[in-house]
Amino acid sequence: IILSDTFYEFAHPLMKQLGWPTIFCHKLETDEKGMIAAYKLRQPDQKRQAVKALHGLNFRVIAAGDSYNDTTMLGEADHGFLFDAPENVIAEFPQFPAIHGYEALKEAIRNASVRDIPA
């Protein structure tokens, strides 16, 4: 599941290229001319709320994020990682391991998982 603070309208082309993975994000509202008139947030702090909901369904959650808006999600997850985050975010949130690069992220996910994920 991808939890993003983008908008469906912006994410659509990339999600198509990725084969339509599940993404939870926000929605833009347009006027009769097709111009952006407003936005609708899924809910406040939607990433953390999604993790809480997954926990309520008895799922374990491994999360990765790169910015301030991800930190409440990372704190709610069973395992949370900062992925290629800026140095100031890493310094402010030392409780989250800082991971650099996709191979290191895959290894961190494998190590955090209770399943045997092949390398």
Regions found by a protein language model. Name each.
Residues 1-119:
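C-terminal cap/substrate-recognition subdomain and adjoining C-terminal extension
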